[in-house]
């Protein structure tokens, strides 16, 4: 049936308020790149990236020096998904709901469910993107240990970020409900005189921990590690290298997959390295290369063993500027389409 969308807008706003109280953690933690311009699937959108600055001495002069230059680069992203939820209601259903006096409530709930579905898809998409694009890992995949009495892992994850030069003003950690339950059990967070606020007790919300904004998300999912065993580094790899050559592996169907967490041994005589690296590009070959998202902290030599960490449900910590979410309205033909009404 046809709908008058100007009246529908109010229902959408009401539903948005309800959906905003779902377990949404990634969307409010990332940079939103959105506008009222429309884009087609596959369209490219550029995002400006500033580079490191170089300090210079000050010299007295009668004119402004112009020998310094500053380069602003860009990252090109593309629209690769177009998603929608349809809510067709037949005339018979409409009349029945109207006679019962429940049409507005039922239709509003349908809009809520539609927005919830799209929100959950976006959360899952961001979870996968961040998982496969992370640089380093710590702990066993959860920010909190099984006793719920310590916050060592969240402190260690923050250390990794700030050691890499991450700003400290807008860091977020997105966790699942299990980690959220453990966080709520930490005694000094439950005591207002120690935590500095009573919000976690009175409102059930997660609060900043060590300057990190902790949020829960229904989009956090388990990562199944690849099946590769026995792989060794087969060449010398310097500090900072991201492309690692390997051989001697047994694929076991899945090999090394994007998002896997790996460590390097020192069987070849290299320096021991306890850093946990995240794989950006994996391999299903017995030999070849894998690509890490962050460079090696210690040089590797041939025969150093590659070990995959266990299957886990990863929590993520990142700065807002580390992840950019591009959203545009779908493209429309210049002459319009067959819709009876549009907003």
What are these regions (language model features)?
Residues 48, 264-266, 309:
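Residue-level recognition of conserved beta-strand edge/terminus positions
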Residues 182-301:
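Autoprocessing Asn-cyclization modules and mimics
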Residues 47, 77-153, 162-179, 204-207, ...:
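Long, contiguous amphipathic alpha-helices that act as assembly "spine/axial" helices in icosahedral shell
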Residues 42, 59-63, 67-71, 236, ...:
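Glycine-centered loop/turn motifs
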Residues 1-80:
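N-terminal "assembly arms/tails" that initiate or stabilize quaternary assembly
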Residues 216-220, 280-343:
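Internal mixed-charge
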Residues 55-58, 87-88, 97, 182-185, ...:
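Short helix/loop capping segments that flank catalytic or ligand/cofactor-binding pockets
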Residues 33-34, 139, 145-152, 246-254, ...:
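Surface-exposed ligand/attachment interfaces on beta-rich extracellular proteins
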């Amino acid at each position: 049936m046809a709908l008058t969308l100007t009246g529908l807008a109010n229902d959408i706003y009401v539903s948005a308020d309800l959906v905003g109280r779902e377990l949404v953690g990634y969307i409010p933690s990332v940079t939103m790149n959105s506008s009222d311009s429309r884009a087609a699937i596959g369209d490219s959108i550029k995002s400006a990236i500033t580079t490191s600055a170089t300090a210079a001495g000050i010299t007295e002069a009668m004119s402004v020096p112009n020998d310094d230059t500053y380069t602003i680069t860009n990252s090109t992203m593309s629209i690769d998904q177009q998603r929608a939820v349809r809510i067709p209601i037949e005339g018979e259903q409409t009349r029945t709901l109207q006679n019962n006096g429940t049409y507005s409530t039922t239709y509003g709930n349908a809009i809520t469910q539609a927005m919830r579905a799209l929100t959950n898809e976006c959360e899952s998409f961001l979870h996968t993107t961040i998982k496969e694009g992370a640089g380093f890992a710590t702990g066993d995949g959860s920010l909190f240990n099984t006793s719920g009495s310590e916050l060592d892992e969240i402190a260690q994850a923050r250390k990794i970020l700030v050691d890499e030069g991450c700003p400290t003003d807008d860091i977020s950690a997105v966790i699942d409900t299990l980690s959220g339950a453990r966080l709520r059990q930490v005694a000094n967070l439950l005591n207002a005189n120690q935590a500095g606020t009573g919000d976690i007790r009175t409102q059930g919300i997660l609060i900043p921990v060590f300057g990190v904004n902790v949020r829960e998300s229904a989009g956090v999912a388990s990562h199944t590690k690849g099946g590769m065993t026995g792989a060794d580094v087969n060449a010398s790899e310097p500090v900072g290298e991201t492309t690692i050559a390997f051989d001697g592996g047994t694929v076991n169907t899945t090999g090394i997959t994007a998002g896997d967490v790996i460590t390097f041994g020192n069987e070849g005589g290299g320096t021991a390295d306890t850093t946990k690296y995240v794989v950006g590009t994996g391999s299903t070959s017995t030999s070849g290369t894998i690509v890490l998202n962050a460079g090696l902290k210690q040089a590797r030599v041939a025969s150093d063993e590659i070990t995959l960490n266990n299957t886990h449900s990863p929590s993520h910590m990142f700065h807002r500027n580390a992840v950019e979410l591009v959203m545009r309205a779908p493209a429309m033909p210049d002459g319009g389409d067959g819709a009876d009404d549009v907003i």
